[in-house]
């Protein structure tokens, strides 16, 4: 027969407080680590978006003031495209992950006519044409610069893979500038 003074394990266990701090710590720490990693990841993504925008803007501003003779604009365009030049404008970005599309266009009515293009033979997309139509008036010259950066996630690439293209973000900015 059982001793009635001993309440048994079923009633002793809930009353015991030994080890509760360790259990709470084990439950809270993974959540805190995920929150910290999420904050770092969001900061990195924000920086990539900001630097991609800066790159496109700087290229459009600088290229819009080249002289309009037959060789100077093309020569100037060729100096912007090497990885070293990209790295100087946006040092936080990896130059090998940057894709540039640059056009100098002359407007004829609402139709942009490409004068120079990088990469050679490229044609403006519908979004680029729409942007330049809003910025550059008839018989004026302007530039279109689109910078795209392929950013790989640091912490959550495996989790984000089903939602993103190969667990990477590709911010893209198009800037149009009236040629001075």
Predicted regions and their residues:
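Alpha-helical assembly-interface signal, strongest on the long, hydrophobic N-terminal helix that forms
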Residues: 2-88
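Short, conserved structural patches
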Residues: 57, 64-180
